């Protein structure tokens, strides 16, 4: 939600290389050994031509081998991943994104030449985003009214808040978004955050 995928796409575009977004749900399997096989097929495909291979939520397959209940399968997956990263052809790039950097295997960290940290947008960025997101929508408030209270939110969360505020006004059959609509949208986002944190803590 902080622009990692967009940054990877721009990187590929600047280099004039094809951009391949790897969907993890197509890699991960409950069958023994199949996840490692799917990873191998992905890297074999990427070796056919110089490209930018992008993994989102990389921690799902690169988690520390000290974690998890099925240590043997986890080791198999991470070991396979380490081998294939080492075999990336010159001219090709691997970019991996995660929100759970503390869970990545230490050996995985050593395979990457560069690490880029993406922070949440600051107040100026929030102000700019709200202004652009709501420019074609009638509002009963100014973006400045909510800038400080939204400084800790990601771009993805800001997008959800704006869309939720629009939805509230539409369901109420009003053409403009009120201050209350936007506050309610922020409260909804806060509750969603809390639920996601609980789910993450229970895993």
Where are these predicted regions, by residue range?
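Walker A/P-loop NTP-binding motif of AAA+ ATPase domains
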Residues: 1-144
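C-terminal alpha-helical "lid" subdomain
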Residues: 123-203
